């Protein structure tokens, strides 16, 4: 009788662990799908602004500065109201390591974590979309004239 109870307990434990492992994998795939659909929504708005002019302190709808642009695209793409400045957006976002960077994450540029002066949105392939002196453009994240301080996830 003791052997039967032991076998039953082992079988039940194995079944339970498989059940939870499957649920965890399912949740992970759902989270990934959600991230992709969120990026698509925000990027759809961002693409419509390509070529719009840069104006310091502007939040849109036809002129932007960098943080005004990210604030605008997240508000109109996802209904998320980001803080106004790049520094405030850095503090607001969940920090992610470069190896975990996903499309839609924010890219923060500055001299240090206490002095962030530019922000853009990662679009994949080592590029971001941002508003800078040439207007709203797609460009490489890494350039000799700036220093990436970190990355942040909004949603």
Please give the residue ranges for each predicted region.
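Catalytic cysteine-centered active-site loop
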Residues: 33, 52-103, 148
């Amino acid at each position: 009788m003791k052997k039967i109870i032991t076998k039953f307990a082992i079988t039940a434990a194995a079944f339970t662990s498989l059940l939870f492992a499957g649920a965890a994998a399912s949740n992970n795939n759902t989270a990934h799908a959600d991230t992709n659909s969120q990026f698509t929504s925000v990027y759809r708005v961002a693409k419509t602004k390509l070529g719009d002019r840069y104006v310091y302190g502007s939040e849109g709808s036809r002129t932007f500065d960098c943080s005004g642009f990210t604030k605008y695209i997240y508000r109109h793409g996802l209904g998320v109201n980001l803080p106004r400045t790049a520094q405030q957006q850095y503090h607001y976002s969940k920090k992610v390591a470069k190896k975990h960077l996903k499309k839609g994450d924010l890219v923060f540029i500055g001299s240090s974590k206490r002095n962030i002066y530019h922000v853009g949105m990662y679009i994949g392939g080592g590029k971001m979309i941002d508003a800078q002196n040439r207007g709203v453009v797609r460009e490489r994240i890494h350039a000799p004239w700036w220093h990436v301080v970190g990355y942040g996830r909004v949603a």
